[in-house]
Amino acid sequence: MIYGIGTDIVSLKRIIRLNKKFGQAFAGRILTPEELLEFPQAGKPVNYLAKRFAAKEAFAKAVGTGIRGAVSFCNIGIGHDALGKPEFFYGPALSEWLEEQGISRVSLSMADEGDTVLAFAVAEK
């Protein structure tokens, strides 16, 4: 059963501006420790940041909280399965919160075209 749906759209220009203004502190604010390790090797670092920012915002909308409490940028990670499909992974506090809410899965789709990045998340009970 669908619990909630979230989407977010981000301009790469916005992420470029934030990255220039705040540098590594910006990445440190929105990426998990695992993502921070991958970030320097990303072929397109700005796209990497933008996709993760959009995906985490979409996640927060799908679960209905916005970014607050256990639903924080550093508790929401994005990885890929064996076939390359994007998927969320969670910090311990968020895993516990999701279980308390009865949310069993949050699916993710991301896309980018030109200056725009889009993420779509579906939370299920």
Curated annotation (Swiss-Prot):
It comes from the Bacteria. Its EC number is 2.7.8.7. Transmembrane segments: none annotated. GO terms for molecular function: holo-[acyl-carrier-protein] synthase activity; magnesium ion binding. It is found in: Cytoplasm. The keyword Lipoprotein does not apply. Its cofactor is Mg(2+). Belongs to the P-Pant transferase superfamily. AcpS family. This is Holo-[acyl-carrier-protein] synthase. The lineage of its organism: Bacteria, Pseudomonadati, Pseudomonadota, Betaproteobacteria, Neisseriales.
